[in-house]
Structure formats: C-alpha cells, structure tokens
Amino acid sequence: MKNQYLCDIGDYGKYALMRAFATAGVKVGVNWYLTEDDGSKDGKFVDYLEKGDLRWLCPDLFDELTKIVNKKNRTIQDIEKSGILPGAGYFSEQIPLGGTPDERLQKRVRWFEKSLEALADAELIFADPDNGLLVSDNAKEKDSEKYILPAEVERMFRGGYNVVYYCHKGRRQYKAWVEYLSTMFERIDDAKPAVLTYHKGTQRSYVFLIHKKDFQKYRGIIDTFHSRWYRLFSEEYTEIGDVTREVTEAPFVVKCSDGAEVTIEKRADGKIQIKNSKNPTTYLVLDADQFCRRVWMY
C-alpha cells in the first residue's frame, strides 16, 4: 500500500469488503504493508467519487472516502481515524529499506514481529501489499517490500488468525494465475480458501485463508456481501475447487419404500444438500430455514 493509492476506485471495493466483516462483528486487523510513494500516476483514479453512480452500494463508505479525497496530503491515517472499519486495528509502520540483503532481511523480520504484536487481538488480518504474494519467499530480493511473503502468511495463520491478502493477476495467463492463487492453499492444506476478485479499474483479488471453525460464518459474510456487489466482484476458484460444497459431517440416509435412498448432508457453507439415488446427477441445496419449511410445511 502507498498513500498515493488512497481512495482510488480499488479502495472502494477493498474497504467495502473489509467493512462487511467488521460490521458483522469480526475483529479486523489491517497491516498496510506500507511503502513509499513512487511519483507514478497510480492511485489517481478517484473520479468515481464525483460521478456518484456507485454510491448506492455502500453510501456511508462512499461519503467518507469523498471527504478524505478532498484533503491535501491524505494518508492512511485518514482511513484509520474515519471509522469506516468499525473496531479495526492497524499496523502502519513502513516496510524498512536500505542496507545489505542480509540487513534488509533482519529488518523485515523485526518489522513483521512488530505487526503481530500490534494486531494481536485481531481475528482476521488483512495484508495489503502493493503487488501480492512473493512466491520465492525471499525478502532479500529487489522490490520484495512490495510483496507479502508466504512465510508471513503461514505465520499469521498458524498463530490462529484468519488471513486475507491482496494480489493482482498482472500478465499471468489463466493456468499460471490459478497456480498462483493456489500457492498458499498447497502450503497450508488445512486452510479453507476463498478468492474474491474486484473488476472495477485494474483487476484486484483478495485471497482468504480461513480456519475450519470459522468457515461457515465467513462464507455467510462473503455470500451476503457478494449478493449486493456481484456486478463488481466475482468469486474465483483455486486448484482445490469450490470447498463450500464439502460435506462436513456424516450423512443421514433414509431408505424409501420404493427402494430409493435419500441422503441428507451438511455442507461447509452451512447449507443442507439432499440427494436421491434415483436421480444421482442432481441434488437439492437448501438453507436451514428452507429445509425446516419443507419438512414441517410452515
């Protein structure tokens, strides 16, 4: 993240997504992965605030970003003070530069440890690097400050946090992109994946690694958010596939008098899946209320 990006069209989608979690009672911790402004024109796309055609999606957020964009020398502290992410914590220290490769590595390690201390009471940590995930996992590389390292993602997840980090497709072809999205899910195979991609302006993706115990709750938040923002966000799948359909408990099987077997299963997203052996290629998916209404006819 750079201060020059603040309030651009990408920020609207980003803060709306994080706000969905914060307003649902999830304690969000933001590590900006802050880097120096570079003098480029990136982050200048704020005219959407003047047009106003996207305001209806999240009016309170839209209006707050409009206030901030009119300030001179706006910084991430303006976001932190605005309250757009209720109850959120922040780590705003810039990623250290300078020195030999070994010195940069040591500085990076200390910086990251400080971030965990600052965000210790978070449930979901959002990491906002400039360019996404550095697959090589090498903090000594040139421009590594623009990336989150796989070791850092794993450290957060193993520390009990759910994690979401920013990345973008760039020039990757489809196969390379799916492999890239799958990197952390292959490394942390007990994490439940979700990937939401924002299509307004430059494509931006948000990769979630969710603990099993929180997956149903987080899926509910994501689904509710996406039902409103579906024109601008799409869900992408990694090589693992769509884990929302995974069965989480032993199925309940009913044998009918005509010989058919009806199987009732609970899915990872909390919905109920019903299959009939006489029609094995199709199944019915219901939420809990729909299931109860069908059973009790109320």
Indicate where each model-derived feature is located.
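Class I S-adenosyl-L-methionine-dependent methyltransferase catalytic core
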Residues: M1-V254
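Short glycine-rich, polar/acidic loop-and-turn segments at beta strand-coil junctions
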Residues: W32-E36, A268, K278, Q290
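Generic alpha-helix signal with a bias toward terminal, lower-confidence helices
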Residues: D102, K175, R219, I264, ...
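Generic structural motif
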Residues: P193, E239, R245, V262-I264, ...
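Compositionally biased non-globular segments, especially hydrophobic aliphatic-rich helices
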Residues: V253, T263-E265, F291
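Acidic, low-complexity, intrinsically disordered interaction modules
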Residues: G259-L286
